[in-house]
Amino acid sequence: MDRVTHFAVAAAKLAIEDAKLDMSKENPLRCGVCVGSGIGGIHTFLEQSLKLGSKGPSKISPFFIPMEIPNMSAGQIAIATGLKGPNTAIVTACATGTNCIGDALRTIQYGDADVMLAGGTEAAVSPIAIAGFANMKALSTNNENPEAASCPFDKKRDGFVMGEGAGVLVLEELEHAKARGAHIYAELAGFAMNCDAYHITAPDPTGETPAACIAAAVADAGVKPEEVDYINAHGTSTHRNDLGETIAFKKVFGEHAYELCISSNKSMIGHLLGAAGGVEAIATVMTIENDIIPPTINYKDKDLDDPEGPLDLDYVPNEARKKVVNVALSDNLGFGGHNASIVFKKYVD
């Protein structure tokens, strides 16, 4: 298995363990997987490409294709856990994890499964991926102070810092979860997705399309915009993303945007690309569970002078905050213009 699949299988097993899900008591045909990767097995791809150049095609591993393709993480999770229900892997760049969670939600709502493992995985910290992102000017160049290089919404932000890992949740139909006495962290209440149709990498500068996605997810959750307490933002620490997200939040929430708590996990763990949505969904759920909002660290200088609009919302700077959170939203944006948003609510029996 490629490193990306190792991450996925490990996260899936940990999720099952945490959920106390006994697969020997479940119908495997009613339990599925939706776990994707933005890039797939890039370590395998690089290794085999170098071997092709140095030793020729006869030396390429017969496992190259199965190890490289992005859907193999979902397949290997099923093999490792025995889940025989719906099995898919969505690829929408950095929106992958959120899209997978949303698709898993719909799978349960449509009645095609009772349990879904959902999220994203990525292992792209490799020379070729770093070079590619660096040459397109997406990465921070603050090499003198790397601990502070990821600084979402800060005036001095200059690009993201790459991270890697996997985040997988157990989504379960409510009555099924109650019947087995599962601990319910939160209710996944809403999902929406759309596309900017604007540029291969840059987000919609008007914020209109991501705003529409966020608004649709909030509506799907059956809540009013003013009921949202917290947003786990995409917050990549790039100029365009953080500005565009702020504009979108203001469009959706109006004056309530200034009462929202907004933070970016990427300030602490970097940008996990296709895994970002999975890990950030878990952080959002734990925010609701514990009523503690994670901070945006490395936030020092407010960006109030941008000609396209000030970044003047509450980004929960530098210290976690104790606050009751009943409704929270997590949003992610991906190259290609992909937008995806999910809404969680505090579960009340």
What is the predicted function of each stretch?
Residues 112-158, 191-205, 235-242, 259-313:
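Acyl-CoA/ACP chain-elongation machinery
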Residues 144-221, 229-230, 349:
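Condensing-enzyme catalytic core mediating Claisen C-C bond formation in acyl metabolism
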